[in-house]
Amino acid sequence: MEPPINAVQLFLYPLRQSEPLKLKDLALCLTPAEREKFARISHKEVQQRAITSRALLRKTLSTQAPLAAREWCFDYGPQGKPRLCDEQFQQTQLHFNLSHSGDWLLLALLKHPSPELQLGVDIERLRMRTSIDTVMRHYFAPFELQQLRNLDDATRREAFFDLWALKESYIKATGKGLAQPLDGFAFDLSSGEACSAERPAEIVSMRRGLLLKPKENTQWQSWLGHMEPGYRLALTLWAPAAINWQLQWHLGQ
């Protein structure tokens, strides 16, 4: 299937406990090196999710171009961000990024000819045990702290995970990861507007156009969504030219 022009395709997959037979089928999508790598993971659930996530990435890429799941090859940036190898990117012009948390895997795909395009996604499960005050002081910009300061405890925790998902999506897009100071940029939660794109029932709300500060970051575009129960997801991307990106959702089984 040819990817739509100017569309960001978002694939949402439930990460349920896989049956042994299904997991074996998924492992057939992997390269020998990947199977060897994942076999070294001692925690069974972590191992299963690693296999499932990589297999679903490969299978989903194969819906966009005439390559078998096992044929995709990846390169990695200095901080480990995966991308298609140069030859396959030239063939397909596909960009991707993925994130998983709890019971869900989120995968973003888009087609664009520029290798300079930057794409990042994050999905986060709200966690009541996280000491958000400590994290805020170390990793949030003054503008973000100001947004959170006057909120009641429950609302502050919700807003904290909104900001964390947005910040993660940004550093995943840049490929710098935690090597990039998290307090060196900020998102404005009061900005943005409702996103009218059709979406799965699991996504209860979606906003687009959340502002990224400082002002020189205006070419970036960000989205923030909420899921039940207690999940939020964020998408951030930059392209060399202004594009009115449209979201297209796909719910996996």
Stretches found by the model and what they are:
Residues M1-Q253:
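Core catalytic alpha/beta fold that binds nucleotide/phospho-ligands
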